[in-house]
Amino acid sequence: MRCPFCGAQDTRVVDSRLSHEGDQVRRRRECGECKERFTTYEAAELNMPRVVKSDGSRQPFREEKLRAGMLRALEKRPVSSDRVEAAITRIEKRLLATGEREVQSRLVGEYVMNELSQLDDVAYVRFASVYRRFEDVNQFREVIDRLESEPDSETAGRQADAFDA
């Protein structure tokens, strides 16, 4: 690796260790010419799969679009940004775990609904109403009835964030 101080090609690794999350390697390097030390980080380059829309068009996966959709559903809801970011990370990991170069937008939507159902019932219903294109109040009622029939412990876990805000 080229030295950022003098541009020499002769650098050596002095120390290597894993980052806290275990997804990066931190390396201390020393230049053979100027003896300066510097740190580099090495991580796997993971390419998110492309998203195939319902009309057949394809577009790159965009984390900011995922975040915007979730935040829109969670607007004015008592869910911490840390929990939202953790949900986004879980969705991205699940998409990568498919091992596919392309995924249907339907799969992304299902992953989002799954995460929102764990975060906040109101946000889940908001997202589901748009995602599944609810056309009448009965469709809302079906989803709400299903949520109400879940054991209280699941609902309590999802709503625990309300008191953390």
Curated annotation (Swiss-Prot):
| Binding note for cofactor | Binds 1 zinc ion.
Keyword Plastid in record: no
Statement: the UniProt record of this protein carries the keyword Magnesium: no
Zinc finger (unnamed) residue numbers: 3-34
Q: What is any one GO biological process for this UniProt entry?
A: negative regulation of DNA-templated transcription
Q: Which UniProt keywords apply?
A: ATP-binding, DNA-binding, Metal-binding, Nucleotide-binding, Repressor, Transcription, Transcription regulation, Zinc, Zinc-finger
Q: Which intervals hold domain ATP-cone?
A: 49-139
Pfam entry (one)? Zn_ribbon_NrdR
Q: What family is this protein classified in?
A: Belongs to the NrdR family.
Function statement: Negatively regulates transcription of bacterial ribonucleotide reductase nrd genes and operons by binding to NrdR-boxes.
Q: Which PANTHER family match?
A: TRANSCRIPTIONAL REPRESSOR NRDR (PTHR30455:SF2)
Q: What is this protein called?
A: Transcriptional repressor NrdR
Instruction: Give the species.
Output: Methylococcus capsulatus (strain ATCC 33009 / NCIMB 11132 / Bath)
Q: What is the lineage of its organism?
A: Bacteria, Pseudomonadati, Pseudomonadota, Gammaproteobacteria, Methylococcales
Q: Which gene encodes it?
A: nrdR
